[in-house]
């Protein structure tokens, strides 16, 4: 992937996303977010509109009857590196506004286009293989994407099963690219046609994640497909040569933990953009005979990643094993509250690991699916999603909240 393309991806596209208890500022491209106080959100709106510290400070003085000079405002914003960047031109652009004050609407969604898969991985969290009895059609998925885009979703992941197995995949990825800032396709890397690679290269905002779970024999054995490693690595190379960002994901277990450095080297040579390793989770098919990774194996992986970062870090972004859960792939994904997983049958869950639904994407409104009451109930009852139970909401602190409560007074 060329550095020019990386630069294009790094240009911010800022938005303020409102929630019942507050606001977050999001870069809709990187999907990193920063939670704002009500005061911070108001200042962000003002700076984005007039692009001037002096004007913003004076507007604040007149509206709030509170002493505020440009120097005082600059000092206040300089207390944090992110808000300090506001004083240096970060907000010299329109701010997109999305969200709801009544419900928790997502900024990112994963669409399981089908549960069908052409592999039979022993650790598949979705137990993929056969499609569900009543899966959404391509036409219905287009309606879903239009609904999500209309409610401010910026980031979409198309997954499966194997996402490419749905009839109309090319049409769906074009629709997704047209409606959303980022599109991520999760694939096993098999059966990619040249025209599909070309299509994604023209779209310009699509990345592909491909799973590589060891070297030749190990990968093929774990995924139940002879020759799968070679074909998937060739796909990574073709996508990278077409300037499509490729993320390689490796699911670690005892049988492949000693092959991490070799896989990283293969990925660097194939032109991949990012490599990340994740632990096998006790869900789906992996529950049968599941054994958590021993500390010795974890340390082995960490050592290999450090060495690989030293060797290949100038060519490949290698995500730190210790911080994998807070990396770019999950940092913004507060399950249920900022991110939804939509199963192939249309039911919405907080993440791909959880079976309990919040509602149905075509039968229920977005407001009902994201209602605080439903989320609180699922937060208490979730069986597999460990993250949602750890979410602690702050006291409500919304922009213009004081004006609403106090009323407008002269």
Swiss-Prot record:
Positions annotated to bind [4Fe-4S] cluster 1: 117, 121, 124
Keywords of this entry: 4Fe-4S, Antibiotic biosynthesis, Bacteriocin biosynthesis, Cytoplasm, Iron, Iron-sulfur, Metal-binding, Oxidoreductase, S-adenosyl-L-methionine
Cofactor note: Binds 2 [4Fe-4S] clusters. One cluster is coordinated with 3 cysteines and an exchangeable S-adenosyl-L-methionine. The other is coordinated via 3 cysteines and maybe direct contact with the SkfA precursor.
Every Radical SAM core domain range: 103-314
A GO term for molecular function: 4 iron, 4 sulfur cluster binding
Factors inducing expression: By Spo0A and PhoP, during nutrient starvation, especially phosphate starvation. Repressed by AbrB during normal growth when nutrients are plentiful, in association with the transcriptional repressor Abh.
Domain of life: Bacteria
Cofactor(s) required, per the database record: [4Fe-4S] cluster
Entry's localization field: Cytoplasm
PANTHER family: PQQA PEPTIDE CYCLASE, RADICAL SAM DOMAIN PROTEIN
Name listed for the protein in its UniProt record: Sporulation killing factor maturation protein SkfB
Organism: Bacillus subtilis (strain 168)
């Amino acid at each position: 992937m060329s550095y020019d393309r990386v630069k294009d991806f790094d240009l911010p596209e800022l938005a303020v996303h409102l929630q019942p208890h507050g606001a977050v500022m999001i870069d809709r491209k990187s999907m990193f977010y920063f939670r704002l106080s009500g005061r911070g959100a108001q200042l962000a709106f003002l700076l984005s509109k007039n692009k001037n510290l002096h004007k913003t400070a004076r507007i604040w003085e007149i509206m709030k009857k509170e002493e505020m000079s440009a120097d005082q405002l600059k000092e206040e914003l300089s207390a944090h590196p992110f808000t300090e960047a506001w004083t240096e031109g970060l907000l010299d652009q329109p701010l997109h506004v999305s969200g709801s004050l009544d419900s928790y609407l997502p900024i990112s969604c994963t669409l399981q286009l089908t549960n069908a898969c052409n592999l039979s991985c022993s650790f598949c969290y979705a137990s993929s293989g056969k499609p569900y009895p009543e899966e959404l059609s391509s036409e219905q998925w287009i309606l879903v994407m239009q609904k999500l885009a209309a409610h401010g979703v910026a980031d979409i992941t198309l997954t499966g099963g194997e996402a490419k197995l749905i009839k109309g995949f090319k049409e769906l990825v074009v629709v997704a690219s047209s409606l959303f800032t980022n599109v991520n396709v999760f694939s096993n890397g098999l059966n990619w046609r040249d025209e599909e690679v070309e299509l994604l290269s023209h779209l310009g905002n699509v990345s592909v994640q491909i799973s590589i779970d060891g070297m030749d024999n190990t990968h093929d054995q774990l995924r139940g497909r002879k020759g799968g490693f070679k074909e998937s690595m060739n796909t990574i190379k073709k996508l990278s040569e077409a300037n499509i960002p490729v993320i390689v994901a490796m699911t670690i277990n005892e049988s492949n933990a000693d092959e991490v450095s070799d896989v990283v080297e293969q990925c660097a040579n194939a032109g991949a953009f990012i490599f990340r390793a994740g632990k096998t989770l006790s869900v789906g098919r992996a529950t049968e005979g599941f054994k958590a990774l021993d500390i010795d194996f974890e340390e082995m992986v960490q050592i290999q990643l450090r060495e690989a970062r030293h060797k290949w870090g100038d060519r490949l972004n290698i995500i730190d094993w210790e911080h994998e859960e807070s990396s770019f792939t999950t940092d913004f994904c507060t399950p249920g509250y900022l991110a939804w997983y939509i199963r192939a049958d249309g039911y919405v869950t907080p993440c791909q690991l959880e079976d309990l639904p919040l509602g149905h994407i075509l039968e229920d409104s977005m407001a009902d699916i994201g209602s605080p009451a439903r989320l609180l109930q699922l937060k208490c009852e979730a069986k597999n999603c460990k993250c949602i139970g750890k979410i602690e909401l702050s006291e409500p602190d919304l922009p213009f909240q004081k004006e609403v409560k106090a009323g407008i007074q002269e």
